[in-house]
Amino acid sequence: MQGKSVSIGAAGSGVYFNALDVLDAAGLSISDINPQYQSFEDSKESMKDGKIDAAFVVAGAPTTAITELATTNGVNLINIDGDLRDKILEDCPYYKAKTIPAGTYKGQDQDVDTITVEATVIVDKDESEDTVYKLTAAIFDHADEIAKENAKGEELSIDKASDIQGVPYHAGAAKYYAEHGVTVNTDES
């Protein structure tokens, strides 16, 4: 990517910080590329028009922007694997290894190894235990209904609830998880 025009997300966005992590692990910095600070939609249009060479996209697969590009222009997904992925996972524990299965996008004939970040609901630590318990229950008790509206809902899993590290879980969420046999870190634990 050195010297290439690359969309790294809007300045200060999650995509921007994820791009910095990947560049750093690859031994690159923003000064090594021609950074473009664009949304997914703008990145998609810039790729279509040949204005950029690459774009960081931090979204669940399949995502609309890539699906559209794969259909209209064709795309090449870049593996984040081997030593690069190992370094990212070691330096940044909030990432997980992920494989995008072959056939997810038109023209993608092979699996693509990459990294992922988990979506997280954050609440104020002073929010009532009852409110947070009810919010957590609303999400997990209705995961099948969420999945009907959005395929990413199929990834909601009580078993993955304890995967997030470094930030304590609210007592209301911890209560719900405990009722379902999952122990999570709280300020009290």
PLM feature spans:
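Bilobed "Venus flytrap"/periplasmic-binding protein-like clamshell domains
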Residues: M1-D49, D163, V167-G172
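Broad hydrophobic/π-residue packing in well-ordered secondary structure
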Residues: G3, A26, M47, A55-F56, ...
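Ligand-binding clefts/hinges and TM-proximal coupling segments of bilobed small-molecule sensing domains
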Residues: A11-D21, Y94-Q165
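Pocket-lining segment of extracytoplasmic ligand-binding domains
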Residues: I30-I122, E127
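An extracytoplasmic/periplasmic, membrane-proximal ligand-sensing/linker region
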Residues: D42, D49, A59-L77, L84-Y94, ...
